[in-house]
Amino acid sequence: MAAKDVVFGDSARAKMVEGVNILANAVKVTLGPKGRNVVLERSFGGPTVTKDGVSVAKEIELKDKLQNMGAQMVKEVASKTSDNAGDGTTTATVLAQSIVREGMKYVASGMNPMDLKRGIDKAVAAAIEELRKISKPCTTNKEIAQVGAISANSDTSIGDRIAEAMDKVGKEGVITVEDGKSLQDELDVVEGMQFDRGYLSPYFINNPDKQVAVLDNPFVLLHDKKVSNIRDLLPVLEQVAKAGRPLLIIAEDVEGEALATLVVNNIRGILKTVAVKAPGFGDRRKAMLEDIAILTGGQVIAEETGLTLEKATLQELGQAKRIEVGKENTTIIDGAGEAANIEARVKQVRTQIEEATSDYDREKLQERVAKLAGGVAVIKVGAATEVEMKEKKARVEDALHATRAAVEEGIVAGGGVALIRARSAISGVKGDNADQDAGIKIVLRAMEEPLRQIVTNGGEEASVVVAAVAGGTGNYGYNAATGEYGDLVEAGVVDPTKVTRTALQNAASVAGLLLTTDAAVCELPKEDAPMPGGMPGGMGGMGMDM
């Protein structure tokens, strides 16, 4: 085990605060509509230019071990805020730096760090309660577009695209972001349920121009096992043929004789069929088959439910208005399932989301909800160069998270104004002693900092603007993009309540930990072993004639 260096008290804190300042100073220049760019070096390819706070924070690793500890703690503030709310990383970093800076002054003057932390926690709890009170629901397309635009660094086209996508697939729908092929942003919407499995044979294609198989008003057969013997399928195929409608077979696999017979029947026009593999694996496959069954009003033919292929009837088959099967995707449009059953299933999956422990499980469950509830929208980001594409894509993803947060918890006035207004609730909070009162003062000062930084980045005098905004009421604030004062909500300068709340909570949490740190343990740098001595000189010819 490597030797460790242990540093105590002020020496440890001072070094860690240096690290906090290095990271925060690099991140905070990106805040607000007039935020500056930061250029990030890449190990290969050109550098990346960004105005995204969390992207800057993630790149920073410091040489000094103690400074790096401080920087990593604030990096945690940024990434936690990004994970929970999708935006607000720069605001959280600015708040954390301010709480640490002000707190260190009080610690240096001999105050008890634990009482300071208790005071900070009391003030933050009161501020969050006030933020919830002043929050208003975000329901209209215009409000959603405004939130998206602000989060994407005042890019209105991104806000409009996200609002349009949410309008098409609903608030719960899946919206994904991909690289586009042109200079313009594009929006593709897939209605109905889509899963990533295509036809098992190209002979099922009946629309050669688009290379897809289209089934109008088909039956849907769902089976959780492999189908290789055509005799198992014959009874149900005969019933479908009599009904004169096409059939989609979704099974673990369809192979051999069964697949060959289906292809021949399809080519001869006897029975229009398409076979695809079931999506997912293991338990997830069973769950997704059940989802499709509920969506189409059918049943999964499985031994567990006492159903077999040979005895299957049309009653067990699902139905849909239209199904499109491509090489890699199958889309079920307008399934015949009952709305009440679909709603109950969505509720059930949402409960599983709340109980899920891993991000991967949660993401997959959310996809299932979206597929059941509405559809999938794909925003294709257009840009002239790859560097611009990366930067823009990161902004679109941020904006998307922010709009989801706004729909979830509502919106407040942006531009740092909500935090200024929430200070009124803290003014009435009293600590149990003078040290706790000092902790409350720390938060009061920190809550001005985001507005100060936005104004500073815009090249104006921060103290004058903060005084003017603090003298106003409600949504009155300073619009840094135009340099004017007014109602920020009317001007479209809004922040999701969840983003502001999460930023404040996470900043106070990590800053409190730093203030109450009294020792730091880090590895000593390894000393390189000296190089071994060189080989002795040669023995020469020893006077021998050759």
Curated annotation (Swiss-Prot):
Output this protein's name.
Answer: Chaperonin GroEL
What's this chain's function? Together with its co-chaperonin GroES, plays an essential role in assisting protein folding. The GroEL-GroES system forms a nano-cage that allows encapsulation of the non-native substrate proteins and provides a physical environment optimized to promote and accelerate protein folding.
Which InterPro entries is this protein grouped with? Answer: Chaperonin_Cpn60_CS, Cpn60/GroEL, Cpn60/GroEL/TCP-1, GroEL-like_apical_dom_sf, GROEL-like_equatorial_sf, TCP-1-like_intermed_sf
Does the record bear Protease in its keywords?
Answer: no
Q: Where is this region: Disordered?
A: 526-546
Lineage of the organism: Bacteria, Pseudomonadati, Pseudomonadota, Betaproteobacteria, Burkholderiales
Return the SUPFAM superfamilies for the record.
GroEL apical domain-like, GroEL equatorial domain-like, GroEL-intermediate domain like
Name of the encoding gene: groEL
Compartments where located: Cytoplasm
